[in-house]
Amino acid sequence: MSASLSRAAAALLRWGRSAGGGGLPGAGVRAASSGGQAEQLDALVKKDKVVVFLKGTPEQPQCGFSNAVVQILRLHGVRDYAAYNVLDDPELRQGIKDYSNWPTIPQVYLNGEFVGGCDILLQMHQNGDLVEELKKLGIRSALVDEKDQDSK
């Protein structure tokens, strides 16, 4: 898995993003795995405030659900996040599913905690919870700025 994570990190750097930051423990259930895979994934999801595992890249999502997650983050003005393309690495793709005990991709983590996939992020966007969660991370949603402009 170490080589897999190296490829994922290299892909992340190719996207022009440097990883940094910290986080709280993830809420997902971890499956026992060999070679410290869970520990390596734990480090990945905690490395940045917002981490997304998707099919493709933010610039070129390869499935509608991954595209929806990217678009929701863009609507909120979230541009600084770590994105890992699971299509580049089958071990990473299966490993993150085992790590979170969630069967599908994309997967979104906020401050090291597993949030869910596209459907949950969309629901959080629609009911306003995403604005609040981003605020807890010190990220001001662009939608709040837009509302402020409209009220003036």
From Swiss-Prot:
Transit peptide boundaries, per UniProt?
A: 1-31
Among CDD domains, the record links this protein to: GRX_PICOT_like
What is the annotated role of this protein in its UniProt record? Monothiol glutaredoxin involved in mitochondrial iron-sulfur (Fe/S) cluster transfer. Receives 2Fe/2S clusters from scaffold protein ISCU and mediates their transfer to apoproteins, to the 4Fe/FS cluster biosynthesis machinery, or export from mitochondrion. Required for normal regulation of hemoglobin synthesis by the iron-sulfur protein ACO1.
Q: Which residues carry this modification: N6-succinyllysine?
A: 55
Subcellular location field: Mitochondrion matrix
Q: Which InterPro entries match?
A: Glutaredoxin (IPR002109), GRX_PICOT-like (IPR033658), Monothiol_GRX-rel (IPR004480), Thioredoxin-like_sf (IPR036249)
The protein in question is named Glutaredoxin-related protein 5, mitochondrial
Tissue spec. comment:
Detected in bone, liver, muscle and kidney.
* Name of the gene this protein is made from: Glrx5
- Do you know which Gene3D superfamilies this protein is assigned to? Glutaredoxin (3.40.30.10)
**Where, by residue number, does [2Fe-2S] cluster bind?**
63
One Gene Ontology MF term: metal ion binding
Ranges for domain Glutaredoxin come to 38-141
Q: Which residues carry this modification: Phosphoserine?
A: 151
GO CC list: iron-sulfur cluster assembly complex; mitochondrial matrix; mitochondrion
